[in-house]
Amino acid sequence: MECSEKPVFYNYTGQELAQIRIMPPDEAVRKLVKKHWDTLAKPLDGMGSFESITAQIGAILGTELIDIHKKGVLIFCADNGIVEEGVTQSGQEVTLAVAKSMARKGSSVCRMAQSIRAETIPVDIGINSEESIPGVWNRKVCPGTRNFLKEPAMTEEETVRAIATGIGLVRECKEKDYGILATGEMGIGNTTTSSAVTAALLQCGAEEVTGRGAGLTDQGLARKQQVVRTALETYDLWHADAFTVLQTVGGLDIAGLTGMCIGGALWHIPIVLDGVISMAAALVAERLFPGVREYLIPSHQGKEPAAVKLADALQLSPVIHAGMALGEGTGAVMMFTLLDMAMSIYGQSATFSEIEVEQYRR
């Protein structure tokens, strides 16, 4: 995909965002896809969850002739002011370094995506640097968020712009004929922001959803949990709406991912979710616009403690259980491979009639 480095901003206002309405996927197509699965020469429901997932994809795309060969991974890169509180092993400079690696196609998700010919699209939505990075899309809302122990992470305007950016990027991909997209992110401190968002939305304690991130010590984990707990109490976030939670303790990457989930529902593109950060964003999107979850495909159950709670809240069932915690979109790209395998059966496998065997009946 040709790199669009010139800044593009999407002029949604908060009022315009509030007017968005989500239409459900095409249930008639869902039934057609399920019916086709039953004609294939295999046991009924032999492909398990993948039969219902492909039916969901068909319903989202609005056709039983499913084409997801053109795949993209939108990777939202942003810095988080909360790193000032010692909740991470590394500093903000790592966000910039990894974004540069992504531009060179050298990071983990890029290598995985190249192996299946999926396109990685790193997006600077809020890196704390004025440097322009060739190969990274410039959609910078602001150079990182604020320390949410001192003040809200974002202003209302910044939050709206970040959400709108995610929506707009999905539209750009739709116009370039992408059939399916995966969520990705890179931002030091974003397991802290996602934990705070998750705890607030699920009305649970910091300890229940805050993990070690990139590998904190016991002391570091305790500090991280205390930071999340203090923020929840200071702003009384257990009683706040989803937008306020996102603005107060979220990140620009999470806001962009929230917009991406909404954009998938608006432009009818299936969105494959990665790990807890993407799922926290998905929960924000679903709380803002009920029905968004119907356009989301889970990939893996990560090892962060929030993973199970988020999946349950979204009523999504990840199929990969490998204890992954790499981020970047790696689990979602792994799901791309499994979907391709399932689609090879759906689109090419012999039917009962072709092998002259009576079809199994339900």
Task: Annotate the PLM regions.
Residues 1-362:
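N-terminal loops that bind phosphate or other acidic moieties
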